[in-house]
């Protein structure tokens, strides 16, 4: 069995290709069920976001599995395989497993270290459980990947620092005021960057938002998003008296606020600090405003410097996570290798215990005079002999499973002990148990899903 991932992302395909291969959320479960019917595909999970569509699968034959995974994508979206093939990323084995860990941890995201993808990976896995396309291998792998990604974020703090200009403004505001609860935000203009900064500030718990714009109607539309107040540009000075934080992005030709305009307001503000962020190009706020004692002025270049420094910190954290992933790969590989040897060991034990049981029956016929206590002692000691005899072969089987050419080595091991048929029977039993457990897990997921959040 092999693990394969086939898909597109923002690195391999332009948006016009990605949008053609994006699954609607409502159809994702049906798509996984359809993929499960494809030849060679044993398990599957599909992750589909605005930046990526990736099909993860456990296949019994590598070449056949790859072929049918590509064919499935082409058929589902009504395109030819040849049309999408140049944009597809195809990874196999350890490379595919490593990719999942990197994706879940946010290392493969457009915004390095973002956490939204972790929730999306988790939701896709939960859905696969619900529809029955995730089995023993993916249940283990995806749980491990999600758990690891949470730990990686917690231990490295990769997402702790802003890497967008709009959120960098929030970070600076927190450094000046500490807590933002109850602070009054004044938005000058209705530009995109200013709006994003306002959204981030509002999400951080500021108390009130006022929007000032040349066009009052636009100011009202933006203010409505934050349950705020709209004012015409002529009332800017009055709005400044109440504000703690000013975000300006008007796109005006000259300065809309100068040192001479703000200086008279300082006494009226009674020394309250005024945090001003100029996101406009050309600038809205006179650089001389920084000379005022209570004004903290930052422009777009200052914010870019903050973002660059924060990105460098994220890259350091990402390097740590890459190292952590290597340990996770080793742990999963060891688990996967032992997965194949479990039925072999079980069959070997069953054969040995069957021989011991037959021997005990023979002894009962030949030694009818033995007491019940004698039989208990005899049974205990014969089982002890069995366990001692099996100890070295079991250790050897585990080593074979972890070594090169494990499949061929285990086949030879089974032939030596004549347990091929018994191993097949054990695997059927394990498969039946796995299906039953998966059904129980899926039922538990359906019952608990609303409360299982990141």
UniProtKB/Swiss-Prot annotation:
Residues that coordinate or bind substrate: 49-52, 109, 114-116, 120
Active site (UniProt): 50
Database matches in CDD domains: NAD_bind_Glutamyl_tRNA_reduct (cd05213)
EC numbers, comma separated: 1.2.1.70
Entry binding sites for NADP(+): 189-194
Assembly with partners or alone: Homodimer.
Biological role stated in the UniProt entry: Catalyzes the NADPH-dependent reduction of glutamyl-tRNA(Glu) to glutamate 1-semialdehyde (GSA).
Note: During catalysis, the active site Cys acts as a nucleophile attacking the alpha-carbonyl group of tRNA-bound glutamate with the formation of a thioester intermediate between enzyme and glutamate, and the concomitant release of tRNA(Glu). The thioester intermediate is finally reduced by direct hydride transfer from NADPH, to form the product GSA.
Name of protein: Glutamyl-tRNA reductase
Organism of origin: Geobacillus kaustophilus (strain HTA426)
Gene: hemA
């Amino acid at each position: 069995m092999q693990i394969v991932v086939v898909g597109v992302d923002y690195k391999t395909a332009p948006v016009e290709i990605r949008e053609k291969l994006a699954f609607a959320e409502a159809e994702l479960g049906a798509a996984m069920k359809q993929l499960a019917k494809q030849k060679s595909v044993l398990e599957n999970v599909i992750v589909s976001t605005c930046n990526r569509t990736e099909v993860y699968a456990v296949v019994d034959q590598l070449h056949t599995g790859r072929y049918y995974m590509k064919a499935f994508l082409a058929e589902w979206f009504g395109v030819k395989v040849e049309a999408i093939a140049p944009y597809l990323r195809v990874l196999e084995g350890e490379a595919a497993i490593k990719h999942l860990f990197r994706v879940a941890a946010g290392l493969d995201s457009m915004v390095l270290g973002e956490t939204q993808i972790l929730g999306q990976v988790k939701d896709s896995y939960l859905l696969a459980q619900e529809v029955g396309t995730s089995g023993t291998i993916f249940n283990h792998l995806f749980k491990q990947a999600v758990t690891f990604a949470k730990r990686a974020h917690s231990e490295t703090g990769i997402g702790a620092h802003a890497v967008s200009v709009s959120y960098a403004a929030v970070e600076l505001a927190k450094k000046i005021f500490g807590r933002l609860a109850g602070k009054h935000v004044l938005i000058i203009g209705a530009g995109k960057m200013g709006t994003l900064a306002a959204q981030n500030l509002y999400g951080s718990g500021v108390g009130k938002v006022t929007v000032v714009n040349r066009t009052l109607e636009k100011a009202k539309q933006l203010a409505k998003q934050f349950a705020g107040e709209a004012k015409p540009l002529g009332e800017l000075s009055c709005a400044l008296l109440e504000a703690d934080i000013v975000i300006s992005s008007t796109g005006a030709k000259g300065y809309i606020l100068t040192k001479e305009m703000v200086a008279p307001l300082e006494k009226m503000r009674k020394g309250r600090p005024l945090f001003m962020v100029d996101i406009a190009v050309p600038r809205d706020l006179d650089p001389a405003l920084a000379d005022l004692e209570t004004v903290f002025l930052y422009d777009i270049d200052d914010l870019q410097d903050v973002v660059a420094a924060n990105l460098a910190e994220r890259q350091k954290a990402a390097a740590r996570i890459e190292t952590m992933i290597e340990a996770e790969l080793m742990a999963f590989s060891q688990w996967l290798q032992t997965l194949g040897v479990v039925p072999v060991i079980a069959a070997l034990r069953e054969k040995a215990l069957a021989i011991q049981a037959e021997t005990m029956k023979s002894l009962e016929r030949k030694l009818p005079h033995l007491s019940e206590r004698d039989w208990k002692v005899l049974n205990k000691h014969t089982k002890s002999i069995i366990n001692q005899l099996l100890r070295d072969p079991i250790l050897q089987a585990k080593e074979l499973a972890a070594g090169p050419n494990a499949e061929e080595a285990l086949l030879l091991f089974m032939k030596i002990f004549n347990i091929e048929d018994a191993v097949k029977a054990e695997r059927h039993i394990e498969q039946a148990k796995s299906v039953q457990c998966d059904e129980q897990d899926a039922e538990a997921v359906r019952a608990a899903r609303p409360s299982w959040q990141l």
